[in-house]
A protein has these predicted regions:
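Conserved alpha-helix/loop element of class I SAM-dependent methyltransferases that forms part
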Residues: 57-77
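Conserved SAM-binding motif I beta-strand of class I
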Residues: 107-112
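Phosphate/oxyanion-binding active-site loops and adjacent basic polyanion-contact surfaces
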Residues: 53-60, 87-91, 113-117
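Class I S-adenosyl-L-methionine
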Residues: 1-36, 44, 51, 63, ...
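Conserved SAM-binding loop of SAM-dependent methyltransferases across substrates and taxa
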Residues: 88-103
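Conserved class I S-adenosyl-L-methionine
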Residues: 76-87
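Phosphate-coordination loops involved in phosphoryl transfer and adenosine-cofactor binding
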Residues: 78, 105, 153
């Protein structure tokens, strides 16, 4: 018996709506593969509420950073960016994907003290072919003097820099003569709550 199956079932309204919402959220040119690797998108290419919040936050920061990069000589074609306290490197990967990937030059450095996160990020960059990304297992003091980093860094970022990490990122930026620093301390919500109580 010869039975033919339809190659694709028609999209349900729910799936079509989810696809439309995803298209609204994602930036043009954003790699779905990267977002799946970062677990921002599910294997099926869907976005859950927690991931939506994280992505919105990173995209918001990217808008500021992209503008700063474009103001550099040659619109940031050879820019260097160091992401301090990179963690899982969401910010660094998304900046690379949306800004650096299409350019011939420039480099993103992820600086992190947790070795397992550095190794994971290195492996992901290699899998994705992001050849101008480096991940360094260094402290702030070490990174300011490290030979793996250029003498001058154009942009320093630190997203959710805990405890003294914001101060450390500022010290690094000053040591590396950074043109710009984009820093987001993690405790701002705690401080705001304390201020409301007083």
């Amino acid at each position: 018996m010869n039975t033919k199956f339809a190659s694709k079932a028609p999209k349900t309204n729910k799936v079509a709506k989810a696809d439309a919402e995803l298209a609204e959220v994602l930036k043009p040119g954003q790699s779905d593969e990267l977002l799946k690797e970062l677990h921002i998108l599910t294997r099926e290419g869907r976005l859950n509420q927690d991931s939506r919040r994280k992505l919105k936050q990173v995209y918001h920061l990217f808008q500021f950073i992209e503008q700063l990069l474009r103001e550099l000589p040659e619109e940031g074609a050879g820019a260097t960016l160091a992401d301090h306290g990179a963690g899982k490197s969401y910010l660094g990967f998304i900046i690379y994907d949306l800004f650096f990937r299409a350019r011939q030059g420039g480099h993103v450095y992820g600086i992190e003290t947790r070795g397992e996160l550095v190794e994971r990020s290195r492996a992901l960059a290699q899998r994705l072919g992001f050849g101008r990304m480096s991940f360094l297992n260094l402290t702030v003091a070490e990174s300011a003097k490290a030979s793996e980093l250029p003498a001058q860094i154009d942009v320093v970022t630190a997203l959710h820099a805990c405890d003294t990490a914001t101060d450390d990122a500022i010290a690094f930026g000053l040591a590396k003569k950074a043109r710009c620093m984009v820093l987001v301390p993690c405790c701002q919500a705690e401080v705001a709550a304390c201020l409301r109580e007083t």
